[in-house]
Amino acid sequence: MYANEWDIEGIIANRPVAREGENTHRERTGIGIVRSLLRAYGECHPQLVQHDPRYPTMEALLQRTVAGGVGNAAAELVLAALESKDPRPVWFLNWGTDYGSNPSALKLALDQVHDQRGAAEYARLKSRLRLSSDDRFGEHTWDVPPAFPLWVDTFRPEREGGRWYHRFSALTATAGGFDIERDVRTGHGPLGAMYPVNTDRPQKEGDSMTFLYLVPTGMNHPEHPGWGSWGGRYGLREEKGGSRPYYWANVADAWHGTVKRDHVLARWAVALQNDFKARLDWCVAPFEQANHPPLVTVAGEAIRHVKPGERIGLDATATTDPESDALSFEWYVYPEAGSYEGPPVELHSSEPARVVFTAPELDETRELHVVLAVTDAGEPALTRYARLIFRGPQADH
């Protein structure tokens, strides 16, 4: 449902056969399950492109779908992405690679480069990678330099109710009145009907935050895990001494009067589930009968250098909605995402789309983050964001 948001270089089905007792899909091979889902997606594609023409065709995705552990197809798919002339980082999202599955295709690809091409080429290709994944990469994780440039571990640590992986379903399953049968499996086309509740863990959602971290909502920045996103917010793994850019779910947010790790995800739960609901509607409804997210625009630069005591005005009056729905504007300081530790900054507003505040004392090492959440009055109500970052005056060099 989010294939329109990224350029998908490949899909790897890494489990040869579904686990008995856990997944009761009539197709038993991993690659067979993935292909059946893609065929269902293909049936929905004519509707989906009415809502966003960036949705890739079923054929394009099938051409880039391989089974892990079969020859070198999966590793070669990874290497093709790393060797492309496209200068953008390559994000590798890995889940389900544990007991009973094939080794990670990324590990196999890096094994090949390390053993056959030398240290310089290994370092060059590894520098292109960004990871949102559990650790399935063997010696490439900690032992073979250089480090991965950025790694977001959506699995650990265990605290406040278990592994972070296990908190997603608990925090989001019914957020905003979401109902998996009504909103996904019934009346939403062949892809929704295949949503895998046919397991012994209905609505198993621990892996979703792996890619939700990358959904471009206007709030998140993939290179900054500490800023927060629909996948949660992450902190640097301290016991490694900061030697490697490894982030995990060890941080907490203040929300509704308490401070908890769960809040880094719970605060967005209704918005992300409503977004999923809307996309299932897109599978069956024409553009004019479905809702689409607002287009948030704040005048000026997203990152600004300000002087202490300076009066700052923020203007989002250029924000629009595809259906011309009424819009609500919520402005707030996000203290945990920034590094400013001084007195609270108060935002003042005489109209919903504008706020003013007085810049606090900031230096080059401190940031103040202000987030704007805009929600439309459609069904389901959809939310998008803008993040404004304020830093102290630039030093003269």
Where are these regions (language model features)?
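Exposed beta-strand face motif in extracellular beta-rich ectodomains
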Residues: E364-V370
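N-terminal acidic, glycine/proline-rich low-complexity segments
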Residues: M1-G313, T319-E341, T365
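Extracellular interdomain linker/stem segments of modular secreted and single-pass surface proteins
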Residues: R391-H397
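Short, surface-exposed loop/turn segments at beta-strand-coil junctions that are enriched for proline
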Residues: T358-E364
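Surface-exposed, flexible coil segments in extracellular/virion-facing regions
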Residues: Y332-T358
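Extracellular and select intracellular beta-sandwich modules with Ser/Thr-enriched
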Residues: A381-R387
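Short, solvent-exposed loop/turn segments at the edges of extracellular beta-sandwich modules
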Residues: V374-A381
